[in-house]
Design a protein with these regions (language model features):
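Conserved catalytic-core segment of nucleotide-activated headgroup transferases in glycan assembly
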Residues: 10-25, 193-199, 204-291
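Conserved acidic donor-binding segment of nucleotide-sugar-dependent glycosyltransferases
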Residues: 337-352, 360-366
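A short, well-ordered alpha-helix in the C-terminal region of glycosyltransferases
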Residues: 360, 367-382, 391-394
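C-terminal alpha-helical cap of glycosyltransferases
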Residues: 385-413
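N-terminal pre-catalytic "stem/leader" segment of glycosyltransferase-like enzymes
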Residues: 1-89, 93-95, 102
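Membrane-proximal helix-turn-helix segments that form the acceptor-binding/catalytic region
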Residues: 63, 107-122, 137, 147-167, ...
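Carbohydrate-associated surface elements
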Residues: 173, 191
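Nucleotide-sugar-dependent
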Residues: 223-228, 232, 236, 282, ...
Length: 413
């Protein structure tokens, strides 16, 4: 079986945990994967100097479909930046009139995916299609730096979700939301390759014997850690994890992994040590292991976008032997619902819960080791990427066997 992954980046965490990590395991099962980030064109004499649309209209330029022809399954993922983007003010739009009059230079990024989409929607297209997402892009908040990009793609995301023969995702809340577009939704939870979470670097001497508390993400995730202004009056909300750590600061060594260039000044007041953001997952895993965390924290703001996130922080902290404390939600499935509070991690939602949880972890090495050990044992058993690869293989097989089933779905709703 041949699987074509459309427009994916090798480095990023989403592409890795929902694709590249499994390539070698899939190969053992007879599944070949091809990840492409561009489409080639075949030009005939006379096409030189013409705009793409003009050359194609005159029959002088055609899409090289060899990758698509090779595939049994084509997988589309998350969203594609088909809008034009202003890198000066952050505006993203597909409105040609707005692009022409915009005062700054607009950068065109993916000009092919949306343009080709009618061909994938065609009744004559004979390949199975999977749409995969590990975020609920319809719940992204305006403060998120990717909001303009994602909002511009909502119509295409909807079309992709409706067109798919099978829709795959990482969590129940995403599956519930995207189920309005497609009857065939399968949850395939994230997994890890424990072999990459290792290091030969010794435990750093700075911080001495204090327990090392680690938080990772990107600088934007400081909103989850330190809180945020809300409402017309700008009342400060959240930030309970950061407040708890500040109150215990003299008893711990605080580490952040994921500083974006140029934002060091944002991180510096809160942390004793920091690592810059890296996109390559193997390098990130090494950095995480090299930080030698005793405690790994995973605060969240708690909105519907956050509710759709996966348990990846818990998995990765467990892999490097850190005791976990993460955001609890009042009701329903949430990122860390699978964590057994007091057994293989702690959950906290209120300011009191975060403080009491952090205090117990900081002051008890025995508790840290107990929680970390139980979490690692469970993660190695239940979240092995080799087992998850089999779930993906079954999804590919199902999609091929049911290709065209989307025609009986909700395409026109």
């Amino acid at each position: 079986m041949n699987v074509l992954v459309w427009g994916t980046a090798e480095q990023g965490p989403c592409a890795y945990f929902r694709g590249h990590m499994f390539d070698e395991e899939w190969k053992k099962m007879g599944i070949n994967t091809r990840h492409i980030s561009r489409v080639n064109f075949i030009a005939k004499p006379g096409a030189e100097g013409m705009e793409t649309e003009e050359a194609m209209a005159k029959g002088l330029l055609s899409v090289d479909t060899s990758d698509i022809d090779w595939a049994d399954v084509v997988m589309f993922r998350r969203y594609y930046n088909c809008s034009a983007k202003c890198n000066t003010c952050g505006v993203a739009t597909k409105d040609q009139a707005a692009i022409r009059v915009h005062p700054h230079k607009m950068e065109f990024r993916d000009s092919i995916t949306e343009w080709l989409w009618p061909a994938f929607e065609s009744e004559t297209f004979d390949k199975a299609i999977i749409y995969e997402t590990d975020d609920n892009h319809f719940q992204i908040r305006p403060w998120n730096g990717y909001f303009p990009d994602v909002k511009a793609e909502w119509p295409l995301i909807t079309r992709m979700a409706k067109r798919a023969d099978l829709l795959t995702t990482s969590t129940g809340p995403i599956a519930a939301h995207y189920g309005q577009f497609n009857d065939n939704v399968r949850v395939i939870r994230n997994a890890i390759d424990p072999s990459i979470y290792t290091t030969s670097n010794p435990r750093p001497e700075h911080g001495g014997s204090k327990p090392r508390v680690v938080y990772y993400g990107s600088t934007a995730r400081m909103r989850d850690y330190a809180g945020y202004p809300s409402g017309p009056g700008g009342k400060w909300e959240g930030g309970y994890a950061g407040k708890a750590i500040e109150e215990l600061r003299k008893e711990l060594w605080n580490v952040f992994i994921g500083v974006n260039p140029g934002t060091e000044h944002v991180i510096a007041p809160f942390f004793d040590e920091a690592f810059h953001y890296v996109e390559n997952i193997q390098q990130f895993a090494k950095n995480l292991a090299s930080s030698h965390p005793d405690i790994g924290i995973a605060p969240l703001g708690g909105d519907d976008f956050d509710r759709s996130k996966s348990e990846l922080h818990w998995l990765e902290y467990a892999a490097v032997g850190a005791a976990f404390i993460g955001e609890g939600f009042k009701y329903g499935e949430a990122p860390y619902s699978m964590v057994r509070h007091g057994v293989d991690g702690l959950l906290a939602r209120t300011r009191t819960e975060w403080y009491e949880g952090m205090k117990s972890l900081v002051r008890s090495k025995d508790l840290r080791e107990q929680l970390a050990g139980a979490a690692k044992e469970r993660v190695l058993k239940e979240y092995d990427y080799k087992e998850r690869a089999k779930e993906w293989a079954d999804a590919f097989k199902w999609a091929v066997e049911h290709k065209g089933i989307w025609k009986n779905g909700r395409r026109n709703t």
